[in-house]
Amino acid sequence: MEIKKRIEELKNNQTGLTFYSSQELNDLEKIVKLREDLNKYRDSYYNDNKSLISDYEFDILLKELESLEEKYPQYKEISSPTTSVGASLKENKFKKVEHLHPMLSLANSYNIGEIVEFIERIKKKIPKEQELKYCLEVKLDGLSISLTYRQGKLVRAVTRGDGFIGEDVTENILEIASIVKTLPQAIDMEIRGEVVLPLASFEKLNNERLEKGEELFANPRNAASGTLRQLDSKIVKDRGLDAYFYFLVEADKLGLKSHSESIKFLESMGIKTTGIFELLETSKDIEKRINYWEKERESLPYETDGLVIKVDEINLWDEIGYTSKTPRWAIAYKFPAHQVSTVLNDVTWQVGRTGKLTPVAELQEVELSGSKVKRASLHNISEIQRKDIRIGDRVFIEKAAEIIPQVVKAIKEERTGNEKVIEEPTCCPICNHKLEREEGLVDIKCINEECPAKVQGEIEYFVSRDALNIMGLGSKIVEKFIDLGYIKTVVDIFDLKNHREALENIDKMGKKSIENLLNSIEESKNRDYDKILYALGIAEIGKVTSKILAKASKNIDKLMAMTFEDLTSIEGIGEIAANEIIAFFTKEKNQKIIQGLKEKGLKFEIKESEASVQNVNPNFVGKNFLFTGTLKHFTREQIKEEIEKLGGKNLSSVSKNLDYLIVGEKAGSKLKKAQEIPTIKILTEEEFIELKDKFD
């Protein structure tokens, strides 16, 4: 059901609304309002060069929307601000062009605890013996830009746009004095950076506009964006825009092994960088530099809204991975938002679908950013202990990238001695079962497979829109069915038809609603294999990964039989995901659920129409391919599609699992690494075509 239809349905039943359906109505109306507002703010920010709210306030609203969409996954939409970058471009004189490589955004963090978590996630994804270094750079508050050089000549400049399509502003970029038009070497490269208006130029510009009676720019970022989109290039030249660059796309093709090397390379080409670049090794080092730059940023000649932390080693980036919006190997630290202090009265614990316990601070009500606040996030018990936060403390709270505010720190100077240490719970607050914490991890979990909170979360996830999309099983109905004993596992959903008479006696369950629910349950048996995989709720396995697994395994029996090596050889499946998959299928409970779902009629296999293999090439089936350098006969996407069509798999890095490396012009470090592994066959583009045509 579409969200607006559900809202209308609830509104038409105002007299019969329960507390829970009333809450649902409020939440759904909030989702619609948040989407409308966030899209309006993005459109104004990216297309009209006007900030209607601060970045900080935008992040709060976005996080609130993310949380509500997680609560009501059946109403998620592809067009939601939570799943896209930038904004759709308006029609103007600038040509719309596709980025050669998507311009992703960065995940935001607002406290050092999130940086610590970021680093811990990185460590889990790579071998323990791997030494890690992190690059710390200032985050400029300007207009993101991508420059393309061909044979050393600047040929194209494109704005971020929506991350996939931007505006060609080459003519105006050429008017910025600091932009290098011709490189000292005749090379091809793409670089990313930020166009800014220096603070001195911003002040001068606004003074001039004030004298002319013109509207003042709210901030340097809006001024820079508005200037770069001027129809008259002379205005761009006169206003004194500047540009700093921080990223070299596909630096490994130029033989560079680290981000720090790529920055030095850019500087050797005359490309302007901020010059603020630090290599650090630990979260403690990063915390020290964050504290330093929070004070020193005011001395910089341009506006900055935070810092960026990146893994330095380029060859680790693919292994660490990406989300649909952001790289997992980089994170932005946003400088602190407005803080207020209040008293921590108590701590309550919430239990999620996976059994994870989350501590919530119960606060003395206080106003923050125009709203009343009485609850805040405490993240996890490790954060509580690290910050030494106690019940009765006066604490600083701030609104950042959280649905609710977060507790930043305790004001220890105001302690009276009556404060109580927050104890780590030993029993689940819902089912009273014992809790466990895996060695080296921060989360406490309820391990009772029958915990009502976990069961309800699993059911809601299973029936959500992106999974089996079963209409009529909202949170309160699921809770009711669990209480009545009709549902203990997801398999029981398909036996609800046996309780038709009993269902009719449930408050608010009319015959029509029951009929629609049972029909929706029956229809769900025909969902695609990848949807059913996603619905199982395997940790680390989202929508995209489910598609990858479905395509690679063809059916669940083959997937369940896969070894760790089999799984990690699949492009897009890392070590953490592989371990989670194996752990999931090893559990007897999950094996029984899968068998039960099969018996109910769910098809854990790719449909015959999807599994056509008429185009496969015996030379490609089961083989792993990778290409490097510039290809003459294919674009990157074309060659990937060709390989997959013929039965092969695309890898993103050189490893012992690679069978063929296709080498184009100006091949980078991948060629050198492949030459060190005797089992890898190295092909020219022409040899690849010959291999393909043998059975094409």
Curated annotation (Swiss-Prot):
Zn(2+) binds at residues 428, 431, 446, 451. GO terms for cellular component: cytosol. Its EC number is 6.5.1.2. Keywords: DNA damage, DNA repair, DNA replication, Ligase, Magnesium, Manganese, Metal-binding, NAD, Zinc. Its cofactor is Mg(2+); Mn(2+). Pfam families: BRCT (PF00533), DNA_ligase_aden (PF01653), DNA_ligase_OB (PF03120), DNA_ligase_ZBD (PF03119), HHH_2 (PF12826). It catalyses: NAD(+) + (deoxyribonucleotide)n-3'-hydroxyl + 5'-phospho-(deoxyribonucleotide)m = (deoxyribonucleotide)n+m + AMP + beta-nicotinamide D-nucleotide. NAD(+) binds at residues 55-59, 105-106, 137, 160, 194, 310, 334. Signal peptide: none annotated. One of its GO terms (biological process) is DNA replication. Residues 615-696 form the BRCT domain. GO terms for molecular function: DNA binding; DNA ligase (NAD+) activity; metal ion binding. The active site is at 139 (n6-amp-lysine intermediate). Belongs to the NAD-dependent DNA ligase family. LigA subfamily. HAMAP family: DNA_ligase_A. DNA ligase that catalyzes the formation of phosphodiester linkages between 5'-phosphoryl and 3'-hydroxyl groups in double-stranded DNA using NAD as a coenzyme and as the energy source for the reaction. It is essential for DNA replication and repair of damaged DNA. This is DNA ligase. It comes from Fusobacterium nucleatum subsp. nucleatum (strain ATCC 25586 / DSM 15643 / BCRC 10681 / CIP 101130 / JCM 8532 / KCTC 2640 / LMG 13131 / VPI 4355).
